[in-house]
């Protein structure tokens, strides 16, 4: 009985060790795998995000503690072009789909039909938006 219990415990510990190694390896091997979006969604870098109707001028920065005063609609799409998340509104930094550009600064790798780039600085954080002229 003791032998079976010990074997089961060793097997369990071994499986946990293998799982921990594979999780650590996959994270290290794919540091750019996901893009964080406020709202709790994580998109693969090959997914598409549409941002239309951004009201700030290209290159405009807003510093300090105030609102960015950006109005936009963001469409997060899966790889089959199905909309999985849509948000519309202003003060995008606080409420809506912000791309964490530090994950992968070449944002056009996962933005679709990017026609203009917007850099918004809010509380010292620089965020990059790609605006699309139309929703497909």
Q: Model-found features: residue ranges?
A:
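N-terminal prepro-regions of secreted/extracellular proteins
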Residues: 1-51
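Mature secreted bioactive peptide module from preproproteins
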Residues: 29-136
């Amino acid at each position: 009985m003791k032998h079976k219990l010990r074997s089961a415990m060793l097997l369990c510990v071994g499986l946990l060790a293998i799982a921990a190694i594979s999780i650590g390896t996959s994270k290290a091997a794919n540091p750019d795998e996901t893009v964080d979006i406020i709202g709790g969604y994580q998109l693969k870098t090959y997914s598409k995000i549409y941002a239309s109707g951004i009201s700030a001028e290209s290159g405009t920065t807003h510093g300090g503690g105030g609102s960015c005063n950006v109005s936009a609609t963001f469409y997060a799409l899966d790889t089959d072009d199905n909309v999985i998340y849509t948000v519309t509104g202003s003060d995008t930094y606080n409420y809506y789909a912000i791309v964490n550009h530090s994950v992968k600064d070449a944002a056009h790798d996962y933005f679709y039909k990017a026609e203009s780039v917007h850099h918004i600085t809010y509380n010292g954080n620089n965020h990059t938006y790609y605006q699309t002229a139309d929703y497909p």
